[in-house]
């Protein structure tokens, strides 16, 4: 992880480059940890901010499992199955928790990313941020 370069954040020629970056954006916005449904919700919002239409969002969401697997293989992301609470159920729910291996470094690399800044301003309400 120490040798992580900006190239890993920019994506690669493997076909998932921009989706990998979108996952990293979502993980940074979620402070390095995300339950699977929260990650997918954040990705949908990112894609909406980027102007993707419904069909593009469906195509992208179908590729996300492969993208997550690839990021885990690169040791940028890890996951584990855990129990979490769910207000609609009386029992805990087993779900997947994703974690960035080096959240601080990736956050620094994406600190001036226009999509991250726009999300923080428009969705999270951080009005003091400038583009």
Language-model regions, residue ranges each:
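Short, positively charged loop/turn segments that connect secondary-structure elements
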Residues: 44-64
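Secondary-structure transition/capping residues
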Residues: 34, 50-54, 117
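Short amphipathic alpha-helical elements of helix-turn-helix/winged-helix folds
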Residues: 22-30, 42
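A short acidic, leucine-rich amphipathic alpha-helix
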Residues: 38-40
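Short capping segments at the starts of secondary-structure elements
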Residues: 28-35, 48
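Residue-identity detector for threonine
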Residues: 42-45, 96
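Phospho-regulated, low-complexity intrinsically disordered regions of nuclear gene-regulatory
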Residues: 2-25, 57-65, 69-131
């Amino acid at each position: 992880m120490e040798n992580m370069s900006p190239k890993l954040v920019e994506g690669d020629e493997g076909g998932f480059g921009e989706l990998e970056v979108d996952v990293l954006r979502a993980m940074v916005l979620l402070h390095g940890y995300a339950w699977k449904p929260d990650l997918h919700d954040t990705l949908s919002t990112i894609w909406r901010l980027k102007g993707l239409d419904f069909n593009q969002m469906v195509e992208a969401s179908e590729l996300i499992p492969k993208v997550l697997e690839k990021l885990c293989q690169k040791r940028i992301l890890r996951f584990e199955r855990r129990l979490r609470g769910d207000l609609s159920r009386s029992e805990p729910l087993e779900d997947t928790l994703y974690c960035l291996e080096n959240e601080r470094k990736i956050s620094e690399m994406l600190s001036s990313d226009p999509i991250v800044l726009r999300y923080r301003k428009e969705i999270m309400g951080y009005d003091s941020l400038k583009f």
